[in-house]
Design a protein with these regions (language model features):
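Short, basic-rich loop-to-helix N-cap that marks the start of a DNA-contacting helix
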Residues: 41-54, 70-72
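Short alpha-helical DNA-recognition segment
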Residues: 17-36
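Key DNA-contacting residues within the recognition helix of helix-turn-helix
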Residues: 35-36, 45, 64
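DNA major-groove recognition helix of helix-turn-helix/homeodomain DNA-binding modules
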Residues: 28, 47-62
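Short polybasic/polar patches that bind polyanions
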Residues: 12, 25, 54
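A short, Lys/Arg-rich alpha-helix, primarily the initiator
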Residues: 1-17, 61, 65
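Active-site phosphate/pyrophosphate- and oxyanion-stabilizing loops and adjacent acidic/basic residues
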Residues: 12, 21, 50
Length: 72
């Protein structure tokens, strides 16, 4: 699993120009929790991973379990 910083960068990129409040409300989490996920301070628990993936229309694996091309 990528580290929290990589996951955070992915979440920030997916959010784009959407306000954090919009994403947080849609996923049933606080803005502060989303901020911690996006800044790499915390990794969301599995239930929240699913909610975020659904919101962004992505597979959970695509966001949270990407492998670097040099990993084997």
């Amino acid at each position: 699993m990528p580290d929290a910083a990589v996951i955070g960068a992915t979440l920030r990129k997916l959010r784009g120009d959407l306000p954090r409040l919009t994403v947080a409300n849609a996923c049933g989490i606080s803005v502060s929790a989303l901020t911690m996920y996006e800044t790499g301070q915390r990794v969301p628990r599995d239930e929240i991973k699913v909610k975020l993936a659904r919101f962004y229309g992505k597979a959970v694996d695509a966001i949270f379990f990407k492998q670097d091309s040099h990993e084997m």
